[in-house]
């Protein structure tokens, strides 16, 4: 693998200029589409070191000063895609995490520095010497939104639900749990069959959201229709494809810190319309700003743009063995791209990552060739190496594989303008490497359904990222992972990931993940493209909106400026 930079006199720069011309010619068609998708949020070249790019200083926002905000008022936030099921066990999208953040607290949270801090727990877990017993103390005097007491028994019930509910996306995240016990009302004891280093980090996300046992029992499989948790706000109403409303929860244990009366999340899938609504004041917060809109929004005196490097990535995923659905055992598909890794490798060689970052995102995003953020303590130079952009190598690999050229393949993507611009850029690039890429735009909800069912050859989608790399890797490429929509199964990868899960030693895990990523570049079930910036527009009429590296927009403790 080579590492190089792009200069304005290089061939890569010339390709970027040519790509810009292609995109200018196609942008009018893209702008007419308005369905949901993640690319606005959720480079050589491929040969440039991952993480390169000029993206500016991080701005996470600040907590609300109680003396500077009013009591009461309604906040309207525009979401770039509709949240999926509002059930922490079943949810898969970043957009549901925005809503959950205001209504479903977790055992642990992450702070602005991406460090783990207690939330419903009172301290970080204690772990036995053999790593197989984890003890967590939880808050007292807390109630769920329906009045049910929050205690260790409720935590036990919620974790057991995550482990047993059909379709749960949390089971693989929670690892080798064999039992959960409520030692006393304030103490939870988790038993493991083997040490599991990522457990605490997993409890900072949906696996750590504790649901009301009363509501879970009463609603059963319909829990998402009226979710009940512990949080500053509680669920009020949902209008599909339109809005989700939350109202202040008087049962919340820190209700005196909640300033707003109501939060309304409105689904506005077109980035330019979200920006226009920000300018007009019809919405006060907007997620996933388009890189095309950021310069203009920064000039608005009534607005601010919060931006920070995310822990996630955007990429493309090949369907290798998802023949019977993501929950079924992998069974290799009878297609050249599934059966021969040289076809997938050729696709990676054909992509100019730096060109994508420069032309599509104005260098706000950065090149990514790894699921691990360069800022992570688990990162290394080896983990961030990129495959060089080399169209001739791409064509040579296709020839070795004995497939027809140009090799035809269809890619599904969200049909919002930014996602389509990205897809068209990829289409233009890989053509030079011997591919005939067809683009199939679909709504975001449909994309999630199709990837689960294995109804695709190639898809473009990303991941908002987590602080522990296990959550960015194992669920997606580990055999049987809850989000392994590729149906990829590789014993070497599985063995390395299993070893990394069982050790607390950072240096050992760092080395193991570097080996995993090297193997992924050899097999290419998923090609990482770029690491997105968290770009959030906020009205200056609000105080206290924050966006941390986990990508979640935090509005629950915001307030209207006096």
Segments predicted by a language model, with ranges:
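Extracytoplasmic/peripheral linker and loop segments enriched in polar/acidic and small residues
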Residues: 68, 125, 342-345, 357, ...
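Alpha-helical secondary-structure segments
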Residues: 151-158, 185-191, 231-232, 260-262, ...
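Surface-exposed binding/hinge segments that line
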Residues: 137, 172-215
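N-terminal lobe/hinge region of extracytoplasmic solute-binding protein
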Residues: 4, 75-127, 160, 228
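Gly/Pro-rich hinge or "lid" segments in bacterial periplasmic/extracellular proteins
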Residues: 204-258, 262
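Structural transition elements
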Residues: 366-400, 418
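Acidic-aromatic pocket-rim loops
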Residues: 312, 316-325, 446-502, 549-552
């Amino acid at each position: 693998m080579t590492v190089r930079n792009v200069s304005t006199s290089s061939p890569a720069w010339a390709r970027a200029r040519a790509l810009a011309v292609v995109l200018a010619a196609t942008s009018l068609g893209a702008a007419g589409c308005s369905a949901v998708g993640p690319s606005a949020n959720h480079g050589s070249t491929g040969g440039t070191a991952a993480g390169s790019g000029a993206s500016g200083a991080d701005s996470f926002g600040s907590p609300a000063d109680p003396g500077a905000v009013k009591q009461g008022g309604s906040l309207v936030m525009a979401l770039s895609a509709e949240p999926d099921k509002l059930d922490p066990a079943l949810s898969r999208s970043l957009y549901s995490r925005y809503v959950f953040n205001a209504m479903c607290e977790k055992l642990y949270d992450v702070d602005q520095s991406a460090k783990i801090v207690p939330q419903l727990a009172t301290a970080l877990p204690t772990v036995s010497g053999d790593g197989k017993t984890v003890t967590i103390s939880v808050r007292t005097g807390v109630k769920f939104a329906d009045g049910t007491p929050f205690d260790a028994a409720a935590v036990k019930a919620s974790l057991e639900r995550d482990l047993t509910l059909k379709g749960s996306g949390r089971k693989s995240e929670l690892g080798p749990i064999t039992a959960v016990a409520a030692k006393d009302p304030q103490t939870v004891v988790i038993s493991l069959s083997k040490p599991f280093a990522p457990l605490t980090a997993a409890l900072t996300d949906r696996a750590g959201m504790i649901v009301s046992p009363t509501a879970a029992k009463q609603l059963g499989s319909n829990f998402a229709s009226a979710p009940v948790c512990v949080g500053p706000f509680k669920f009020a109403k949902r209008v599909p494809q339109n809005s989700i409303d939350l109202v202040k929860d008087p049962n919340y244990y820190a209700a005196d810190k909640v300033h707003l009366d109501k939060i309304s999340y409105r689904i506005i899938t077109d980035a330019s319309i979200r920006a226009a609504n920000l300018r007009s004041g019809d919405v006060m917060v907007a997620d996933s700003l388009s890189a095309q809109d950021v310069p203009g929004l920064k000039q608005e005196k009534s607005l601010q743009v919060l931006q920070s490097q995310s822990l996630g990535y955007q990429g493309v995923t090949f369907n290798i063995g998802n023949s019977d659905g993501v929950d079924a055992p992998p069974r290799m598909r009878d297609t050249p791209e599934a059966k021969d890794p040289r076809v997938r490798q050729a696709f990676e060689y054909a992509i100019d990552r730096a060109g994508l970052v420069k032309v599509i995102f104005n260098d706000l995003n950065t090149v990514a060739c790894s699921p691990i953020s360069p800022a992570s303590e688990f990162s290394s130079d080896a983990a961030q190496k990129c495959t060089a952009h080399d169209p001739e190598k791409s064509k040579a690999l296709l020839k070795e594989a004995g497939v027809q050229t140009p090799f035809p393949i269809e890619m599904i993507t969200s049909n919002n303008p930014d996602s389509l611009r990205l897809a068209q850029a990829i289409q233009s690039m890989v053509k030079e490497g011997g591919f005939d890429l067809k683009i199939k735009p679909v709504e975001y909800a449909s994309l999630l359904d199709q990837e689960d069912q294995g109804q695709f050859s190639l898809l473009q989608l990303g991941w908002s990222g987590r602080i522990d790399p296990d959550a960015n890797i194992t669920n997606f490429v580990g055999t049987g992972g809850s989000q392994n929509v590729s149906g990829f199964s590789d014993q070497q990868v599985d063995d390395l990931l299993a070893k990394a899960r069982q050790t607390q030693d950072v240096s050992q895990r760092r080395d193991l993940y570097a080996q995993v990523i090297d193997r992924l570049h050899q097999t290419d079930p998923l090609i990482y493209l770029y690491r997105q910036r968290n770009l959030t527009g906020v009205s200056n009429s609000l105080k206290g909106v924050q966006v941390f590296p986990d990508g979640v927009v935090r509005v629950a403790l915001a307030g209207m400026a006096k």
